[in-house]
Amino acid sequence: VRFHSVGGWGAITTGKNLGAIIGDLNDLLYDRDKVVDEFGNPKEIIHVSANPKYGSEKKGAPTSYFMIAAPERIRVNCDLRHVNVVLCCDPKAFTHTNPLDGMSEGGCLVWESEEEGEAAWERLPLWARKQIIDKNIRVFTLPGFKIAREATDRGDLQLRMQGNAFLGGFFSVSPMLQDFRITPEQFRDAVHKQYVKKFGKLGEAVVNSNMEVMTKGFELVREINVGAIEAPDRPTLRGKALVPMAMAEGLAASEGCGTG
């Protein structure tokens, strides 16, 4: 799993919570199934490792978070080039990086956007559409900021809570809960336990708000149909093309600069 976000938006905290919750689900599976290793010790059914990446400037700068959840221990702890899931919390990510880099065939991209269907597909740049089609990547949109705005009036908390929507989105698009026969109640209990541990000192209202954002993220993630690569090109956050003043006025390239 790879996160793409911005410093100050809480993605690192979300990534840590995600790893801790999966660890708690592993404990739940042991308590339920009593699986032991060859030495009779509790067996790790889901191995988790994770690490963040961000610059010294941190706030406002692009950040990444990498996490592995696997049935066998993977003895590396580094930036991941090959991933199955990308949680793209940064709606501008396609303007400064390639969130699809290293995605596996049939992987899942969850992207911050309030749009769905054809409208969302037309927001993706042409080069990204080609990679999505070539690799048969499933694309989901999630209105994380809208969900966070509805949960709190505080602007700083809206930014930091957005990542919780993507935590819910991850479990919604991942087959993990179904594969391990984890019920919705067991899942919510594991998340609530982690949120109490992480945010409990801030009060019950903060825990409940984060639970609300996570739950709506789980429910509101939407898969978009992959359209044609030739669909209208309407990427967001890209201004109109500008031309030099001389060209706009019909002057020769050498005119208008350094004359007189």
PLM segments and residue spans:
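Active-site cofactor/cluster-binding pocket
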Residues: 1-259
